[in-house]
Amino acid sequence: MRKILSNCPVSCFADEISVSLDRQIQVLNELGIKFVEFRSADGTGVADFTDEQAKEAKKRLDAAGIRVSAVGSPIGKIGIEDDFEAHMKKLQRIERIADIFETPYIRMFSFYLPENADPKDYRDAVMKRMERMVQEAKASRLVLLDENE
């Protein structure tokens, strides 16, 4: 099993190991995992990182030989009727974090619909928002990876 995995890059959410970035790094190294989908560390979600926090996390990961495969963002984890402009500002912030982490990938979601709603009634609204986010990411040479919930 280990031989197979040695030829296949493995990435994980290390914040499910521990809140502490130091502990995350320790366990990743013990397991031989060299990639992380960075979502949070030391009690702060990646979307709330300052540039300084992101640079420090990147420095610590680099020192351990661990690369960020993608930013595990909360983008799209809002209601389809929620304030989209504020969310676009958050996406722009996460684009900056992705740049610091030297990854072109941002994991995101495709919005929550109202309870008992018919998805067909919201398809156009979802697609319009997704298109705008894709264009924003594309302008920054980034790729959005949609996770369906």
Q: What are the roles of these predicted feature ranges?
A:
Residues 1-4, 27-29, 58:
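N-terminal carbohydrate-binding accessory modules
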Residues 2-21:
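Boundary/entry segment of secreted carbohydrate-active catalytic domains
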Residues 7-11, 35-37, 65-72, 103-107, ...:
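Structural preference for beta-strand elements that scaffold enzyme active sites
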Residues 20-26, 60-63, 79-149:
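Active-site acidic/histidine proton-transfer and metal-coordination neighborhood
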Residues 24-34:
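N-terminal G-site helix/loop of the GST-like fold
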Residues 31, 39, 100-101:
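Structural motif
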Residues 37-62, 110-117:
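Glycine-rich, proline-tolerant flexible connector loops at the mouths of alpha/beta enzymes
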Residues 75:
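Aromatic-lined carbohydrate-binding surfaces of glycoside hydrolases
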